[in-house]
Amino acid sequence: HQPLPAAATVISDVRCTDAFDKGKGRGAIILLETVLTDKATGDKLCTMDSVLFARGDGGYGGPQGSPDALPQAPIRPADHVVEFQTLDRQALMYRLSGDRNPLHCDPDFAAAAGFEKPILHGLCTYGHACHAVVRTTCDYHPEKLLSFSTRFSAPVIPGDMLQTHIWEEEEEIYFTTSVPEKDLIVLSNGFATLDI
């Protein structure tokens, strides 16, 4: 709704907008809407829509639909390709954001969850992609970014090189982020809108 202030006390109001039952043993999809409001002024700062996949929580008898179709990048070479090298210790540094999930720092916990080693926080990968879009399409003017969304497709391991492919279609931006040495798409169906 407006640029986020550098300092503010915000109120976060989260509500479930929908849920889809994928069936017993197949999970459920939960749609959430979060509205951030400046406590001092009452002004809406932003609205965030999230789609969560709840593994093992299907089969409860709810509707079996699915979220809206995801945006697709144009079928042509990307207008921009941006690379970011993540650091081997990046997940440990990113814990300063307050996410203390042991999946990002404990090798035994990560192995028990089925990963070869601790994985990078999804929000960190998301931030790298957002930085790439703001850098290439907004010339580092984040206030021009009106919306930003993507689908988390695969985990990133700290130390992976991230490569973000960006397509510009006037005020609409499409992007994907990959780990090229693994031939792995980690963020798919990326879509952003700009105030141009």
Where do the PLM segments sit?
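Residues that form or immediately flank small-molecule/cofactor binding pockets and catalytic motifs
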Residues: R55, G98, P155
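Catalytic-pocket segment enriched in acidic/His residues
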Residues: D108-L184, F191
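HotDog/MaoC-like acyl-thioester-processing domains
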Residues: Q2-V81, P158-G159, Q163-I196
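Hot-dog-fold acyl-thioester-processing enzymes
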Residues: G62-Q64, P71-Y140
